[in-house]
Design a protein with these regions (language model features):
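Conserved G/P- and acidic residue-centered "switch" motifs that form tight phosphate/ATP-binding loops
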Residues: 10, 112-114
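Conserved GNAT-fold acetyl-CoA-binding loop/helix
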Residues: 19-45
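A short beta-loop-alpha structural element at the N-terminal edge
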Residues: 2-16
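Conserved acyl-donor/pantetheine-binding loop and adjacent beta-alpha core of acyl/acetyltransferases
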Residues: 52, 65-109, 119, 124, ...
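Conserved GNAT acetyl-CoA-binding A-motif
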Residues: 118, 125-138
């Protein structure tokens, strides 16, 4: 398995991975209506991460089986479909970097791929001068992030079109400690 920086040519395969991961791994945590609303309105590829070179994937000969990244930009979560404005850069001395858009193929869940992605994020964020991470965790993702030392700062409910509400958890941790 190869870990590499995602490129714009990976976007179609990443969209398919995100849809499959979200629909399958969220089934025990969210209702079908919540999953479909989140897939349509929240989950997706953030092409700014790809342009910045901070979105990674793990691939086999069959294509991407895991993806995730970090960001030095203000957006905390969501794909391109959530963005309406410019996405300004953060100040690494005063603001936390973002962990963004971790998705794993259901057949590869709990095989250490997300941890490999997280390690790449730590290296990149530390090199850029950041000392803290912040993220918005899905309910299925929260236990994974907690295992990395993230703590819940706030419980958030996101209201989506159609009156669907989806719970998330804003989490953070220092990144200058071992991961």
């Amino acid at each position: 398995m190869n870990l590499r920086v995602a490129t714009s040519s990976d976007v179609p395969a990443l969209r398919a991975l995100i849809d499959l991961s979200a629909r399958t791994l969220s089934a025990d945590f969210y209702s079908p209506a919540q999953i479909e609303a989140a897939v349509k309105h929240v989950f997706g590829v953030d092409t700014q991460l790809i342009a910045d070179g901070t979105y990674f994937l793990v691939e086999t000969t069959d294509g991407p089986v895991a993806a995730g990244g970090w960001s030095a930009r203000r957006t905390l979560y969501g794909g391109d479909q959530m963005k309406a404005d410019a996405d300004p850069l953060l100040d690494p001395l005063a603001e936390p970097a973002r962990i963004r858009a971790f998705f794993v193929h259901p057949d590869w869940a709990r095989h250490g791929l997300a941890r490999r992605l997280y390690s790449a994020c730590v290296d990149g964020a530390l090199t850029a001068g950041f000392r803290r991470f912040e993220l918005m965790a899905t309910s299925p993702g929260e236990p994974f992030y907690a295992s990395l030392g993230f703590t819940v700062e706030e419980r958030v409910t996101v209201s989506l079109p159609g009156g669907v509400e989806v719970p998330f958890a804003r989490m953070s941790r220092a990144i200058d400690s071992p991961n």
